[in-house]
Amino acid sequence: MQAAGEIDDDGFMDMVASSTPSVGYCNSMGTATTMNSLAEGLGMQLPGSAAIPAPYRERGQISYETGLRIVDMVHEDLRPDRIMTREAFENAIVINSAIGGSTNAPIHLNGIAKHLGVALNNDDWQKLGHKVPLLVNLQPAGEYLGEDYHRAGGVPAVIGELLAAGLLPHPDVLTANGKTIAENCQDCRSTNTDVIK
């Protein structure tokens, strides 16, 4: 727009400054939003935490709750290897397809799985994710921004929709809060079906 003469330098800077709420937050379904969503989908983040924009007060609240929960997890001996099982990774692959996640997701999740000794490869992504419908209408492929994703219900709403459709392969996997993914999300639905279908 600037190169075409449609806006001046000040207009360009205003557009850039308003395109994202702050540092530390990806307002599209890039690698950061994808991996936050998949960390929650794997069960390693508290429910509802992945899509909270960085400057929101909720981000500070969930950070505090996460710190408290980590202490409890130590006392409960709830280790990452008990949460990030093969079944949890299969769920994450399905969630990635539903959110329209970044093409970097297989590289990252396969690497995390390998580190944990969980067998996961690119064939799994094709087998598990190929028939899952795209539920999230988020830029760059869609219309909406990350804040809209959060307001529409974020990852719990996506998982709730997948559960309702019978598309989440392992609803009984354990998550960081000590509950199953189904217990956390079975009643969650999108509050804006333009953003999360």
Residue ranges with predicted function:
Residues 1-197:
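Catalytic or ion-coupling anion/metal-binding cores of large enzyme and transporter domains
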